[in-house]
């Protein structure tokens, strides 16, 4: 059983020593399950972060995602969102904002996880939802972006859908804690979404994801049980079976007679 949550310094000290685990969760229940399972890093959207979230995952390193262009745009908005996350119990924030914003957050003591490779919010610049870094020129751009984040003061970076040899070489040549999303095991942490791990993703499942449970089938089974229970209730009411005598409150015959006399 873990007794203390890791710090930024702890993650940096473990760079190159082991593979950390990182999961993006969609609910407090998932956060608690991830924490109980021993997940090292839990990422969550800023709208879900709260003191309750921190309580259910006391020993995980929590990264709060500040969604670019939605939760924040300007540097001041990022600073406010970053401090709000830390005050709720987060350990760091994820940001795809510009380098100036990341540098400013670092200056104010907000630990930042950046993003390189395929960045969904900026996918039009790299050709859409597809791998990045498959040519030497493209790989060099990923490397430059990583070094720029390092220079700006980020302590870690998600590297998404980049060829494993490229991601591995980048990880070995940067001080950043490199978090692999579909970029192989040569980085410092592996990152997946809970929806893919748990099998609740009903849309496109990316090639790099791996399913470990089928909660969507279980959800469908439970939903059918709900329908059946509600239908049985409807039938019971309409047939006169509910409520039966055992579920009623009684009244003394004389008291009932007195009541009826009073209202008639």
Question: What would you call each of these model-derived segments?
Answer:
Residues 1-264:
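Alpha/beta enzyme core
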């Amino acid at each position: 059983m873990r007794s203390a949550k890791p710090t930024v310094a702890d993650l940096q000290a473990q760079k190159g020593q082991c593979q950390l685990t990182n999961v993006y969760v969609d609910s407090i229940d998932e956060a608690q399950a991830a924490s109980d399972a021993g997940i090292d890093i839990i990422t969550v959207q800023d709208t879900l972060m709260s003191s309750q979230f921190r309580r259910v995952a006391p020993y995980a390193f929590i990264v709060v995602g500040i969604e670019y262009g939605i939760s924040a745009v300007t540097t001041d908005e990022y600073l406010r969102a970053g401090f709000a996350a830390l005050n709720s119990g987060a350990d760091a924030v994820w940001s795809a904002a510009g380098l100036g914003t990341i540098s400013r957050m670092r200056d104010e003591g907000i630990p930042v996880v950046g993003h390189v490779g395929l960045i969904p919010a900026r996918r039009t610049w790299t050709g859409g939802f597809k791998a990045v870094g498959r040519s030497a020129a493209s790989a060099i751009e990923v490397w430059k972006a990583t070094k720029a984040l390092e220079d700006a003061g980020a302590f870690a970076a998600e590297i998404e859908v980049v060829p494993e040899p490229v991601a591995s070489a980048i990880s070995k040549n940067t001080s950043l804690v490199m978090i692999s999303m579909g970029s192989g095991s040569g980085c410092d942490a592996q990152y997946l979404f809970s929806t893919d791990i748990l099998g609740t993703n009903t849309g496109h499942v990316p090639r790099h994801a791996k399913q470990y449970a089928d909660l969507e089938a279980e959800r469908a089974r439970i939903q059918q049980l709900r329908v059946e229970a509600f239908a049985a209730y409807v039938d019971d009411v309409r047939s006169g079976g509910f409520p039966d005598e055992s579920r009623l409150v009684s009244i003394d015959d004389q008291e009932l007679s007195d009541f009826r006399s009073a209202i008639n």
